[in-house]
Amino acid sequence: MTEQQTNGATDANAPQFSLQRIYVRDLSFEAPKSPQIFRQQWEPSVSLDLNTRQKALEGDFHEVVLTLSVTVKNGDEVAFIAEVQQAGIFLIANLDAASMSHTLGAFCPNILFPYARETLDSLVTRGSFPALMLSPVNFDALYAQEMQRMQEAGEVPTVQ
């Protein structure tokens, strides 16, 4: 009986991670040169900006938002601009500060990316443009680069 109570206490302090919800927080699409752009030779150049942010909610819940912004030019003209903010609510408990920072900064965005990529691709094809085939992103490497940049700048990472 004592063993069971001890195990129960240990389990209560064990790290917890659970995805609660995935949703589109914001979505936009602009094709400023349509319909003329559809009659031109298609020679696109793609620019992708990626950003993540997180916010502590009540209790052990956290919102993580992954933003993908794509600008595609055909020659010198902007063919389209598309942006998606893919968000998730995660239950994360009993992690040390470094593990919490890594989970929010790399692990959660890695979960959100396939949803954001599919939403962005669907948005672009509905605008009558060729599908975007975004390559997978190594969020662990991006997180490590950001931690190194912060360390060199003397900044302290914070979990909000």
From Swiss-Prot:
UniProt key word Manganese: no
GO cellular component: cytoplasm
Pfam families: SecB
Gene Ontology terms: biological process: protein folding; protein tetramerization; protein transport
Annotated compartments: Cytoplasm
Gene Ontology molecular function terms on file: unfolded protein binding
Keywords assigned by UniProt, alphabetized: Chaperone, Cytoplasm, Protein transport, Translocation, Transport
Family: Belongs to the SecB family.
Protein task: One of the proteins required for the normal export of preproteins out of the cell cytoplasm. It is a molecular chaperone that binds to a subset of precursor proteins, maintaining them in a translocation-competent state. It also specifically binds to its receptor SecA.
Subunit structure: Homotetramer, a dimer of dimers. One homotetramer interacts with 1 SecA dimer.
Name under which the protein is recorded: Protein-export protein SecB
Phylogenetic placement of the source organism: Bacteria, Pseudomonadati, Pseudomonadota, Gammaproteobacteria, Pseudomonadales
Primary gene name: secB
